[in-house]
Amino acid sequence: MSRIEGVLGGQLLHEQVRWGLREFAVYCRIELGELVEMIEMGVLEPLGAEPEQWSFAARDLQRVRTARRLARDLGINLAGIAVILDLLEERERMSVRLRAAAGAFD
């Protein structure tokens, strides 16, 4: 698997790149308050115990983008969005495992 997590805005994002709280908010074009609310509701789980220590990875960018689309397009609240995002990630993990298991029988 490539070490590239994704492509956003024409930039390749390495999976080991980390952003602090303010830097991440600016990069996502999101207000700090909205970002903190996403964290409080479980949409995002940054590394670090305190806001000053929080850091975010490339996968968090995709979660923010998806969360904002779900809220805007479908009117889903943040608690619901957190559940949906977790289920989507679980589905992806299961899909990877299924493909690996199917490949073992080829």
Model-derived features: positions:
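Arg/Lys-rich, alpha-helical DNA-contact motif
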Residues: 2-27, 32-36, 40-106
